[in-house]
Structure formats: structure tokens, C-alpha cells
A protein has these predicted regions:
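Active-site neighborhoods of divalent-metal-dependent phosphate/nucleic-acid chemistry enzymes
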Residues: 57-59, 72-118
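A general structural signal for well-ordered alpha-helical segments in protein cores
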Residues: 20, 44, 63-66, 81, ...
Length: 132
């Protein structure tokens, strides 16, 4: 089981070449093994915000896109529950202030699973295992 960051989700679904071979392999091996690829529900919010700001264009409306992603075998969205919300404000060490990143990292820590991300700020954070 692993969790993917928002940009990784977009790159993976769209087949974007920005997705590293290591990240693609980790996602594919996870799905092929019958395990789950986890996506924080904050990613749906983040994608919607990027669309509203004109920074992301999808091939369909965001509701349909998220619905299609959720239909992929082995992909599961996890809601931001109270524990994740609270833990995102109490991350150990020095971590940047991006709320979505904090929620995703808190989810990875709660589930004790690696996070697939290209975000250097997260990769350099010593309190979560990353893949990229």
C-alpha cells in the first residue's frame, strides 16, 4: 500500500512524462500485487482549486474525473478525518505550511505507508518515507 501526492495523481492518470520511472513502477507494482493506492480526499480539493485558478485543465469536469479515478481497481480515496486534521498541525520536526501537503503527509504517517511525491520539501522531510 502507498499514498500518492496530488501532482503524482494527475501525472499518473494523464500519462505525463514528468512521472519518474521509479514512481510509475511503485504505483503499478502496488496495483498488480492487489494492494491499494491511497489518495487523500484533500487531493480532490487541491485539483479543484488548481482548475478554478486556471493552473490545471482536465479532459472532463472535475467531478467526472475524480469519479473515474475512484473506479480504478485498487485506488481508494481516504477522507481527512479528525485525527488526520489534528495530526497535520502537529507534524514533528520542521515542515512547511502548505495545508494540502500537511494533510497528505499526516495521512501517510497515520497509515504508516510510503508517499509517492516529487515535492522536494516532502522528500527532504525526515518523518515520512517517500518514493520518487
Amino acid at each position: 500500500m502507498l499514498i500518492i501526492d496530488t501532482h503524482i495523481l494527475v501525472w499518473w492518470v494523464s500519462g505525463d512524462k514528468s512521472l519518474s520511472p521509479t514512481a510509475a513502477k511503485a504505483i503499478n507494482q502496488t496495483l498488480d500485487s492487489g494492494s491499494e493506492v491511497i489518495i487523500s480526499s484533500i487531493s480532490a480539493w487541491e485539483i479543484s482549486m488548481l482548475i478554478e485558478k486556471g493552473r490545471l485543465i482536465l479532459s472532463m469536469d472535475v467531478d467526472s474525473w475524480i469519479d473515474e479515478v475512484s473506479q480504478v481497481d485498487g485506488v481508494r480515496f481516504i477522507s481527512v478525518d479528525n485525527e488526520i486534521g489534528i495530526k497535520s498541525t502537529q507534524l514533528p520536526g520542521d515542515f512547511h505550511k502548505d495545508r494540502a501537503d500537511r494533510m497528505i503527509v499526516a495521512t501517510a504517517r497515520k497509515l504508516a505507508i510510503p508517499l509517492v511525491t516529487a515535492d522536494e520539501k516532502i522528500i527532504n522531510y525526515q518523518h515520512v518515507k517517500t518514493i520518487y
